[in-house]
Amino acid sequence: PNSDPLHKVTILPRGMALGVTWTLPEERHTYSREYFQDVICKAMGGRVAEQIVFDHVNSGAANDLEQATMIARRMVREWGMSDAIGPMAFAGQQQVFLGEDLMTSGREYSDEMARKIDEEIGRILREQEQRARDLLVKHRRGLDLVAQSLLDNETIDGAMVSRLIQQGLGEPSKQPNDTKPNV
């Protein structure tokens, strides 16, 4: 509920991607921790759905994992969005200057802090992966309906995804006779 609204989903290949999910970014000047958690959770969704449905994972979610990791890293290192690390910001890797210890590669924090940062990034990713799993298990029927609609139509809009998820929960759709996707 805190991230940008879903616009469209397609299973048609786009560039290197086997399918794409588009959102409609809202104009914002600042972003909350909850916003980034939702973005990471959404990025984990495809990989987790594959685990739930097929009981395996493949390399298809590589870009999603890369984006999720980058956001989690920035949450911890730049935006002070980690309770474990606290309100600290660490600049990106600096160039190594003559006489500087090559082992630290220009870091402005200790090996112990680097370990804590890595642990916190991993915790955020695992937490949002579990959240995605819990949501997809709860909405499994909706997931199956969305998947079937994508197989039938290749592309569906965000409103159709919402209707299919509501249908999967047994909730009445706002437009009960509307089964054609709006693309």
Whereabouts are the PLM-identified features?
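Soluble catalytic regions of large protease machineries
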Residues: 1-183
